[in-house]
Amino acid sequence: MRVRASVKTLCRNCKVVRRRGVVRVICTDPRHKQRQG
């Protein structure tokens, strides 16, 4: 899980999702998981 100021999709499987006001990137590649912090 990466924590970043700006989350971006890294590949075509990445999706930007808002959960409880937190912006996240979910992907089939676990290295692409991100969270805005």
Swiss-Prot record:
Tree of life domain: Bacteria
Record GO terms (molecular function): structural constituent of ribosome
Pfam families reported for this sequence: Ribosomal_L36
One cellular component (GO) term of this entry: ribosome
HAMAP family from the UniProt entry: Ribosomal_bL36
Family: Belongs to the bacterial ribosomal protein bL36 family.
NCBIfam families, per database record: rpmJ_bact
Name assigned to this protein: Large ribosomal subunit protein bL36A
Organism expressing this protein natively: Methylobacillus flagellatus (strain ATCC 51484 / DSM 6875 / VKM B-1610 / KT)
